[in-house]
Amino acid sequence: MWLEGYSSLSYVNDWRDAFAGSPRLSADLCNINDLLDMPRFMRRIRDYDLVVVLHSAAGDSMRQVRRATAALDSRRGPLVVFFGNEYAGMTEKIGFARDVGAEFIASQLPIESARWLYAACNPARVLASPAALNPTVYKTAEGPRTIDIGFRGVLYAHPFALGDEERTDLLRFFVEGARSWDLVTDISFERYAAAEWAAFLNRCRGVVGAESGTYYLERDDATRRAVIEYVGQHPNATFDEVFELFFARYSNPVSGKAISSRHFEPVGTKTCQILLEGDYNGILQADRDYISLSKDYSNIDDVVRRFRDDGYRSALVDHALDHVLAEHTYTHRVNRVLDEVL
């Protein structure tokens, strides 16, 4: 089950295509936004040995997939739910998983954080299912790389509610410092569809980024809702003000910082990544698969020096691609899920 309309969020289509193309499955795709398609598939729900709800159907809104609750209750095979945006709307998402008795929840989060987040969904098993690479779309192309540091992307909705501005501050830092480092930058806040994004990456020698998500996972969205309400009432509030009020004394936070598809796509195009130090689900290794920048930027001179070294940069992107192609494509991810659930 998926939802059409996410052409600029390529990972949701990459997961769909990987399941649909798996030689281990004979898969039917149900677009839950199709008023004819959806009821037809729900009437046949008992015909299926496995039911998968993908991120697009259980991400921004649960309204459409909720219409399938009664049908899902009558399924014969196990249900795997992939939730998108695991930093928002978690009350509804956890409630859905419990109401339909999902046997498996596939999470993009580091596994211990995911188990904490979905503890109320017991006995559902939580599967580590982070993003991956689609090597048929994200691959190298002929042509010059005229941009040193590039970026295309959009800001999170309600960014203050995440509790940090790491990526925004990082981009601002590179825009302001580019001239002194003699780097050509092309940084703007817009989202490209997959083919256009891949073409842009192939014009870039490098991109900058940070882990996705929040340091403050919550099962009930209490802090997120409070921040959104506060900012709505105080539209001129600064991030520092919001952080001091809602996050500075936050007790025992559980981090939901994670690797995302945006960290795999440059690997496919051999575009060097300069990333803020982080764990990246233990998949990408600092200074082997990307150049690691300290969170206080204290090693920026060394980072720029290494980035400008063509030989170093070439060896790094080659290593990253070999590593990811060996273990971290969407084909690998789907096979691992199927190994667990069938």
Model-derived segments and spans:
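Catalytic binding pocket for nucleotide-activated donors in carbohydrate/polymer assembly enzymes
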Residues: 1-32, 80-81, 98, 196-342
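Extended catalytic core of nucleotide-activated donor transferases of GT-like folds
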Residues: 1-122, 134-138
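Glycine- and acidic-residue-enriched helix-capping/strand-helix junction motifs
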Residues: 5-12, 158-168
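Aromatic-residue-lined binding/catalytic grooves and analogous aromatic/hydrophobic interfacial grooves
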Residues: 124-131
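Acidic anion/phosphate-binding donor-loop and adjacent secondary structure
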Residues: 132-145, 195-196
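Conserved donor-binding/catalytic core segment of Leloir-type glycosyltransferases
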Residues: 143-162
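A conserved nucleotide-sugar
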Residues: 168-186
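Active-site donor-binding acidic/aromatic loop of nucleotide-activated sugar
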Residues: 184-190, 210
